[in-house]
A protein has these predicted regions:
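Blade/loop signatures of beta-propeller domains
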Residues: 5-47
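Extracytoplasmic beta-rich repeat domains
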Residues: 9-12, 42-67, 94-109, 118, ...
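Short glycine/acidic-enriched loop and turn motifs that connect beta-strands
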Residues: 22-24, 81, 121, 161, ...
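Beta-propeller domains
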Residues: 78-87
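Short loop/turn segments that connect beta-strands within beta-propeller blades
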Residues: 86-89, 126-130, 166-170, 206-210, ...
Length: 373
């Protein structure tokens, strides 16, 4: 008799880290609605008067994503609060106030949330109640989204150090020598972390002790989270270049320059590359989302948005979803770059969507967090 087949694996029921996991390559789950994009609910946060900007600064999850589990959405806001909302209707479950804006994606690990912000602290919060378990002080702002592996928390700081803390009590396990200010996040593959710096370096670090395995020159400030794919490391920088390096030794394989754009940003890239099926997908300040071949960096297609693209574009079930600085959310076909649906939801979307069960969670600069389908 035929052996009974094991039940099919359940799709993941959470997006717990920035870009899904420590390797930054789980982008979410469908299924997608057959209808055009529509707002299911929105939640309004408060603003903060402009310490970084002349205008009052609002907005959520810049430049990260919310994190989402089976029932709740967690995100940090420019108003200095960490929020937990009911994913179904956007109602407030709890809020935790810090001393300054929060930019990074909160990391969900078990019953804990790891959050970090511009007040120099890393916070460990009980995700069910919103109460503080511990906090750890760094030397400067922490925009980098953390990752937790085997009860160790890893993150890079704008103070130039890469840190490893104990999840239980926040005790320091190690911090590296000063590498350069890290505003972007990192990805983990094969026991190593890959992270770019403001100085224009790409580091490959040994996670066990933080030692440098190799360093490659990008040559410009990089806020991108590197993507590791089939023995190569992909990243981008504010000079408008997308780079591909050898994962083993950091040798440059190719680079591609996005052209055009206006203002001081021109074609600069703040987004992170999404590498799937032999293709690299990334948006630029010139308003285009590019699809490049992963092996040679040649353009497959490009899509013109309504404004600059600073957020990253997760790819789920054949669709890329991303916002632009004109306030539009776009859903396009990853196959050929053709628009499926777009909707103006806010003013200035710097953030990246989290996608779970075909629902899209994204923050905008108007201080609102949106759920769309």
């Amino acid at each position: 008799a035929a052996k009974p087949q094991p039940p099919p694996p359940k799709p993941p029921s959470s997006v717990p880290f920035w870009l899904g996991n420590a390797s930054r390559n789980f982008y979410g789950t469908g299924p997608w609605s057959k209808d055009p994009l529509q707002v299911v609910w929105s939640f309004e946060t408060k603003g903060i008067s402009g310490r970084l900007h002349k205008d009052p600064w609002g907005g959520s999850s810049w430049p990260g994503q919310p994190s989402v589990d089976e029932k709740h959405v967690y995100f940090g806001s420019a108003d200095g609060r960490l929020y937990c909302l009911d994913a179904k209707d956007g109602s407030l479950v709890w809020t935790y106030k810090t001393e300054d804006s929060l930019k990074a994606t909160p990391t969900i690990v078990g019953d804990r949330l790891i959050a970090s912000g511009l007040d120099h602290y890393i916070y460990c919060i009980d995700k069910n109640t919103g109460t503080l378990l511990w906090k750890y002080q760094t030397g400067f702002e922490v925009d980098c989204s953390s990752a937790v592996i085997d009860n160790r928390i890893y993150f890079g700081g704008e103070d130039g150090y890469f840190y490893c803390l104990n999840l239980e009590d926040g005790a320091l396990i190690y911090k590296t020598e000063r590498l350069g200010s890290m505003e972007g996040s990192f990805s983990v593959a094969d026991g190593r972390a890959y992270i770019g710096t403001e100085r224009g370096d790409l580091f490959c670090l040994n996670l066990a002790d933080g030692s440098t395995v190799w360093k490659a020159l990008i040559g410009a400030d990089s806020d991108s989270t590197p993507a590791v794919y089939e023995g190569k490391v992909y990243t981008a920088a504010e000079n408008g270049y997308v780079y591909c390096f050898n994962q083993t030794d950091g040798q440059l394989i190719w680079k591609y320059k996005a052209e055009g754009g206006t203002g001081k940003e021109k074609s600069g890239i703040w987004a992170s590359p999404i590498v799937v099926n032999g293709r690299v997908h990334i948006g630029s300040s010139n308003g285009y989302l590019y699809c490049l071949t992963a092996d040679k960096g040649e353009v497959v297609w490009k899509y013109q948005a309504k404004g600059m693209i600073w957020g990253t574009s997760p790819l789920v079930d054949g669709r890329l979803v991303f916002g632009d600085k004109a306030g539009w959310l776009h859903s396009i076909s990853a196959d050929d770059g053709k628009e499926i649906s777009s909707l103006k939801i806010g003013d200035n979307i710097n953030a990246t969507p989290a996608i779970l069960g075909g629902r899209i969670y994204i923050g905008a600069f108007n201080g609102k967090l949106y759920c769309l389908k």
